[in-house]
């Protein structure tokens, strides 16, 4: 059976439509403001060339905003980067799905494609504006969000260090409860997404830990026990010895959410549920607040240098984990392509085979969920593993708060019931899932 159609802005009034009409131009306007505001910095760093580059970038972004708002055709990329050809091939693929004479455009093409395309065009605008071609237009917002989340970060680092101090005294049941708690922290940390707030302040200002009980009813799919079962399969039944166990985390947002991912990764090692954790980040600035290698390393450095005992202890431990290769950071251009994940084996076989080495792959956040499910109009009750179509590299778990109108694996009637009481339940970030597929 063919999968359902892709979500797109052609459905007037849909979240995709409102995103392309309002939110994406708003993000682009913020990019224009940021670049313009840094004009003096570009001059200090690069002289007149920096000022000329700023003008070029502004002109590029203004033109891009106009193309979007007037539903112009999607254009090929011209920046000769490693992924340029793949993007242009994907544009040809999108053309091949249309009738003769039709062209992919902002409001007609799949939402997943045009939203990813906007961020790749932002990168193109910077790349084509040397000498500022390495500039991250979203870095200021990510840094600000990190510092505004300090109270919540301190609370979480303190909690982790206390937990590790008392670990020997915990029963197996207590350890399980602690892991469930940290999975929930990881889930609700995903609320902090600057691409949804249009780049406006969306930091975590209070400790999530005290709210977990009250948040629990809002977890629509809760596969935490099954996730733990997958992790517990690490003991060899004959010898009782622990096997090497690898967990991968495909990251979403920098800032507070990244700290929740680090805390979970630390606990997995401390509980001996994993012997190594592999993190996957983006190779370019993406979706306003997504984690790049710079954000990853910068965050650990900030914690190391913090004037707070437990924050700096966490930073030191995490740096050590990287040094000893208990933690490994990867980046791959596939994560910033528009492709659904069911195309990974064909488009990026090296990445697919890397994920096949994992015992559990955790996908954080909404964009990953959209790519896992193809961002299609699935019925709410379709099983998660079915919506993944051919993407089954390893047991995988999606941890996301809902901020896009795609959701599968719900019990019959739940989606309809929520619509009748809360029309925006799929986009508010109020509800979440911890959803597992063990199909391999």
From Swiss-Prot:
Residues that bind S-adenosyl-L-methionine: 257, 290
Q: What is its EC number?
A: 3.1.3.-, 2.1.1.-
Q: Which reaction does it catalyse?
A: beta-D-fructose 1-phosphate + H2O = D-fructose + phosphate; beta-D-fructose 6-phosphate = dihydroxyacetone + D-glyceraldehyde 3-phosphate; L-glutamyl-[protein] + S-adenosyl-L-methionine = [protein]-L-glutamate 5-O-methyl ester + S-adenosyl-L-homocysteine
**Which residue ranges does the UniProt annotation give for the motif Subfamily III RTxK motif?**
400-403
Name the needed cofactors.
Mn(2+); Ni(2+)
Asked whether the UniProt record includes Cytoplasm among its keywords, one would answer no
Q: What is the role of this chain?
A: Metal-dependent phosphatase that shows phosphatase activity against several substrates, including fructose-1-phosphate and fructose-6-phosphate. Its preference for fructose-1-phosphate, a strong glycating agent that causes DNA damage rather than a canonical yeast metabolite, suggests a damage-control function in hexose phosphate metabolism. Has also been shown to have O-methyltransferase activity that methylates glutamate residues of target proteins to form gamma-glutamyl methyl ester residues. Possibly methylates PCNA, suggesting it is involved in the DNA damage response.
Q: What is this protein called?
A: Damage-control phosphatase ARMT1
Q: Which organism is it from?
A: Xenopus laevis
